[in-house]
């Protein structure tokens, strides 16, 4: 069984994340979405909210693809999380060259820690290359329209969270 781990903070989950989940589903038998507990990033949404959003959105993809998709909160090393969930592949999305430079370094470190776990990069589709959770939150805070970047449910949750609910 090919088990993959797609880690992220998902604060909030975007259409770019969902695109990677959909595309990874064609490559794997099971996908674990690792929701990182990253206190240094100071997420807007608490862990429970982020997990709930990821689950609500990924269940739709699981229903369409038949892939088993589960969420797994983690705050340990990514490579340890991969071992914990039985993943042999780490899935990462790339938007630009800057992402590649960082991810390339991470792959090197992860290979030193466990050379049996591979990392697979999926390039973001053109319409998703500019999407970043940080930018989506900033646009929402400044009154901009984020409907092109997140699902309607995530849009409502984000606007509610920042006090812009209609």
From Swiss-Prot:
Annotated positions for site Transition state stabilizer: 17
Catalytic reaction(s) noted: (R)-4'-phosphopantetheine + ATP + H(+) = 3'-dephospho-CoA + diphosphate
Highest taxon of the lineage: Bacteria
Any one GO cellular component localisation term in the record: cytoplasm
Example of a GO biological process term: coenzyme A biosynthetic process
Gene3D superfamilies in the record: HUPs
EC class name: transferase
Main location: cytoplasm
Pathway: Cofactor biosynthesis; coenzyme A biosynthesis; CoA from (R)-pantothenate: step 4/5
GO MF annotation: an example: ATP binding
Cofactor annotation: Mg(2+)
The keyword Membrane is assigned to this record: no
Amino-acid positions noted as binding substrate in the UniProt annotation, renumbered to this chain: 9, 41, 78, 92
EC number of this enzyme: 2.7.7.3
Residues the entry annotates as binding ATP: 9-10, 17, 93-95, 103, 128-134
Disulfide bridge map: none
Protein's UniProt keywords contain Transferase: yes
Keywords: ATP-binding, Coenzyme A biosynthesis, Cytoplasm, Magnesium, Nucleotide-binding, Nucleotidyltransferase, Transferase
Family classification: Belongs to the bacterial CoaD family.
HAMAP family named in the record: PPAT_bact
UniProt cross-references to PANTHER family, sorted A to Z: PHOSPHOPANTETHEINE ADENYLYLTRANSFERASE
Function recorded in the entry: Reversibly transfers an adenylyl group from ATP to 4'-phosphopantetheine, yielding dephospho-CoA (dPCoA) and pyrophosphate.
Subunit and interaction comment: Homohexamer.
Record's protein name: Phosphopantetheine adenylyltransferase
Organism of origin: Roseobacter denitrificans (strain ATCC 33942 / OCh 114)
């Amino acid at each position: 069984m090919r088990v993959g781990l797609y880690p992220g903070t998902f604060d909030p989950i975007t259409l770019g994340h969902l695109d990677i989940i959909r595309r990874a589903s064609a490559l794997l038998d099971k996908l674990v979405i690792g929701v990182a507990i990253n206190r240094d990033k100071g997420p807007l949404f608490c862990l429970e909210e982020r997990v709930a959003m990821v689950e609500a959105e990924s269940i739709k993809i699981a229903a369409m693809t038949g892939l088993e998709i589960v969420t797994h909160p983690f705050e340990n090393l990514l490579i340890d999380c991969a071992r914990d969930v039985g993943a042999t592949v780490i899935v990462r999305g790339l938007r630009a060259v800057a992402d590649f430079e960082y991810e390339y370094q991470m792959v090197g470190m992860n290979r030193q820690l466990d050379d049996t776990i591979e990392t697979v990069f999926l390039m973001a589709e053109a319409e998703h290359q500019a999407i970043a959770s940080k930018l989506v939150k900033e646009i929402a805070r400044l009154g901009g329209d984020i409907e092109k970047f997140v699902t309607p449910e995530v849009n409502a949750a984000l606007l509610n969270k920042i006090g812009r609910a209609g």
